[in-house]
């Protein structure tokens, strides 16, 4: 069996194990065993991929395999990875692993919750290993469908409204995406849906002009592209902790990954035609998301709008179409995925104790729960780009690469986008100063306890990942840059 298929097989076996589990301890055992296997598999795959590249492997995708699924439409189960998908698999496995511990005490319906959570994970892993357009779309839908129940049943606040809004908007984006994929298939005339074969065929310019915006918009909705981002803050705010972690940390990255891997790679002329239009929208996303975070008072909404800004920066960097900016975009996906997972984990732990996310009702938490408070400070410092943490490496690579474009329009957009650095500092320092320091105003909060062992373990794992990427970014950027080059070389400026 191909090693990549294990990323689908293991979650499927986890689903079976969860189905037959008879109590909460067995459910936890299945989740810990399965998520640990996935993390170990992702680490092994990363090391193997680097080893094969160093040994001289030149193929664009490694560990490839293809099985005919439906011959009349040339649909195959085709898998393969390059440096981009390898780091996305590693990110996904880290968040699934830590999300398991962040949900350790979740009630009620623990078994059913983890069933849907694992199905969501299956879709995410399957999407990143797929090289067939239809298979990729299928896994994309598998990843979206569980979100409705995970938010609608186990969420909080206006959970039914948030779940329905998220589902309708993302399914609307999927409709555009499906039309775009069919346009690529018929336009290429390749009699295959394999990305590696389609890219060898030239799709007519007029078809690219029509179908590029459909594919980019279809994925862009999931990437919180302005003005189609409104589902994201409500969805984040209402979702349970681990779902918020996976949603913001990984699911939104499917949007940026799809825009780069499918829309821009397969339709480079369309990217040249529409690039400046979408660049304006992404610039607005970056700045608007930051300003929106400044005026929020709910911790989850603050982080949700921060995610809109940071995910907008991913699409912004991709549309700059330079090798350095594209490398920065992938680093930003990885960095933001880890940072926002850490944020949502900590927010969930604080909310579980205080039963409020309103920063006006929180203060003095540094003395009451120092571990969680220090974790929040580290997450905040990473988010505002402190050197030595992941945010600095990613954002500087994005802005340096973006400024390499010599024309006035692109440099103006870059200068506007850099405002997000200052805006981020404003809302992060505001929240840290408000909730962690000062005198505790609520006597009931003085009785609260700090993080438990399972919570500490999840937080420490994420902090290590954030610090590791910030202190030793070379190995990640080296893996990414080699895979960015073939896609960038396709693009027309």
Task: Spell out what each predicted region is.
Residues 33-50, 170-181, 372, 376-384, ...:
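Hydrophobic alpha-helical membrane-insertion segments
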Residues 101-116, 241, 249, 444-454:
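Cytoplasmic juxtamembrane regions at transmembrane-helix boundaries
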Residues 369-371, 428-493:
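Cytoplasmic/organellar membrane-interface segments at the starts of transmembrane helices
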Residues 5-20, 32-45, 89-103, 120-122, ...:
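Central hydrophobic cores of alpha-helical transmembrane segments in multi-pass inner-membrane proteins
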Residues 25-36, 161-171, 369-374, 453-461:
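Alpha-helical transmembrane segments and their helix-start/interface "positive-inside/aromatic belt" motifs
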Residues 2-3, 18-101, 105-115, 191-197, ...:
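Transmembrane helix-loop-helix hairpins at membrane boundaries of multipass inner-membrane proteins
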Residues 141:
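Short phosphate-coordinating micro-motif centered on Lys-Gly-acidic
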Residues 98-104, 122-134, 147-434:
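Hydrophobic transmembrane alpha-helices and their helix-loop junctions in integral membrane proteins
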């Amino acid at each position: 069996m191909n090693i990549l298929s294990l990323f689908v097989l293991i979650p499927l076996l986890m689903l079976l194990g969860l189905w037959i589990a008879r109590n909460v301890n067995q459910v936890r055992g299945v989740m810990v065993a399965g998520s640990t296997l996935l993390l170990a598999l992702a680490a092994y795959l990363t090391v193997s991929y680097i080893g094969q590249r160093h040994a001289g492997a030149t193929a664009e995708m490694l560990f490839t395999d293809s099985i005919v699924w439906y011959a009349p439409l040339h649909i195959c189960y085709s898998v393969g990875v390059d440096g981009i998908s390898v780091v996305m698999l590693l990110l996904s496995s880290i968040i699934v692993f830590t999300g398991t511990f962040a949900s350790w005490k979740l009630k009620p319906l623990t078994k059913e919750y983890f069933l849907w959570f694992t199905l969501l994970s299956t879709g995410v892993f399957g999407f990143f290993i797929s090289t067939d357009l239809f298979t990729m779309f299928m896994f994309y839908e598998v990843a979206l469908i569980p979100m409705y129940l995970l938010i609608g049943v186990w969420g909080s606040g206006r959970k039914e409204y948030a779940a329905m809004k998220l589902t309708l908007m993302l399914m609307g984006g999927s409709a555009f995406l499906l039309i775009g994929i069919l346009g690529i298939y018929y336009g290429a005339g390749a009699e295959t849906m394999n990305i590696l074969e389609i890219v060898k065929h030239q799709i007519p310019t007029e078809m690219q002009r029509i179908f590029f915006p459909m594919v980019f918009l279809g994925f862009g909705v999931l990437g919180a592209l302005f003005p189609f981002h409104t589902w994201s803050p409500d969805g984040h705010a209402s979702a349970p902790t681990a779902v918020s972690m996976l949603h913001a940390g990984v699911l939104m990255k499917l949007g940026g990954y799809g825009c780069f891997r499918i829309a821009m790679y397969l339709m480079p002329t369309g990217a040249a035609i529409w690039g400046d239009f979408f660049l304006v929208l992404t610039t607005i996303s970056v700045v608007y998301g930051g300003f929106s975070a400044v005026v929020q008072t709910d911790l989850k909404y603050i982080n949700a709008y921060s995610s809109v800004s940071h995910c907008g920066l991913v699409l912004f960097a991709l549309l700059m179409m330079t090798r350095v900016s594209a490398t920065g975009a992938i680093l930003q996906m990885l960095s933001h995925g880890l940072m926002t997972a850490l944020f949502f984990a900590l927010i969930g732990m604080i909310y579980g104790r205080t039963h409020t996310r309103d920063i006006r009702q929180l203060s003095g938490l540094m003395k009451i729960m120092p571990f969680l408070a220090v974790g929040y400070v580290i997450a905040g410092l990473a988010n505002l780009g402190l050197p030595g943490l992941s945010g600095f490496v990613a954002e500087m690579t994005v802005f340096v690469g973006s400024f390499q474009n010599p024309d006035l329009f692109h440099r103006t957009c870059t200068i506007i986008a850099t405002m997000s650095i200052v805006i981020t500092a404003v809302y992060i320092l505001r929240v840290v100063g408000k909730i962690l320091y000062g005198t505790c105003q609520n006597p009931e909060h003085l009785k609260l306890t700090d993080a438990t062992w399972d919570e500490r373990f999840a937080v420490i794992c994420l902090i290590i990942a954030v610090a590791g990427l910030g202190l030793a970014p070379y190995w990640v950027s080296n893996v990414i840059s080699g895979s960015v080059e073939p896609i960038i070389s396709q693009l027309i400026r």
